[in-house]
C-alpha cells in the first residue's frame, strides 16, 4: 500500500512493534492541545480506522488522500481510506508491525519482471550510491542490466517512480 509518513520534525519511528489497539471511527486528539478533539467524520484527519502500534503512533486513514506518499504526518503512517480498511480487516491485536526506513524498494512480479523505486531521503538517514542500488539489484540477478549513469539519475530524482529493469529467469 502507498503510505504517508511523519514530517522531518516528527518522523515515523522505525522498528518492530505489535498492533496494540484497533478502532473504527476514531476520535482525533490534537497532539499540541489535547483539549482540541475532532469526532469521527469527514473533518477527522485519522479517517475511519485506527491501528495503534506504539503509544500515540498508529496506522490510519486520512481525510486528505492527496497527502499519501509524502512526509506529512505527526509520526503516524497515513493510508488511503480503502487501503487502511482492507488492512484493518486482515490484522488483529498482536499482529507484528515492522516499520523500515528504506529508500530503495525492489519489486519482482510473478512474471519475473523486476523493477525498483528510489524514494526521497526525507529524514536524511540513508545516503544512496550507485553501488548500493547495484547491490540491491544483484539480489535479483539483474544488476548488469542497469547503467551507472541511469542509476545516478534515478538517485538524483528520488521521485518514487518505477524503473523496470528486466525479466529474471533461472536457466537450467
Residue ranges and their predicted role:
Residues 73-88:
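Short beta-strand-centered segments at strand-helix junctions
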Amino acid at each position: 500500500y502507498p503510505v504517508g509518513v511523519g514530517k522531518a520534525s516528527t518522523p515515523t519511528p522505525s522498528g518492530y512493534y505489535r498492533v496494540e489497539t484497533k478502532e473504527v471511527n476514531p476520535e482525533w486528539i490534537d497532539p499540541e492541545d489535547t483539549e482540541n478533539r475532532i469526532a469521527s467524520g469527514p473533518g477527522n484527519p485519522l479517517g475511519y480506522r485506527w491501528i495503534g502500534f506504539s503509544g500515540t503512533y498508529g496506522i490510519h486513514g486520512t481525510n486528505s488522500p492527496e497527502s499519501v506518499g509524502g512526509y506529512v504526518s505527526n509520526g503516524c503512517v497515513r493510508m488511503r481510506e480503502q487501503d487502511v480498511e482492507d488492512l484493518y480487516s486482515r490484522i488483529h491485536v498482536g499482529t507484528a508491525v515492522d516499520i523500515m526506513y528504506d529508500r530503495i524498494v525492489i519489486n519482482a512480479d510473478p512474471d519475473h519482471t523486476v523493477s525498483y523505486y528510489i524514494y526521497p531521503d526525507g529524514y536524511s538517514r540513508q545516503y544512496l550510491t550507485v553501488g548500493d542500488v547495484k547491490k540491491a539489484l544483484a539480489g535479483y540477478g539483474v544488476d548488469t542490466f542497469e547503467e551507472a549513469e541511469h542509476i545516478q539519475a534515478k538517485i538524483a530524482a528520488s521521485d518514487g517512480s518505477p524503473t523496470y529493469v528486466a525479466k529474471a529467469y533461472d536457466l537450467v
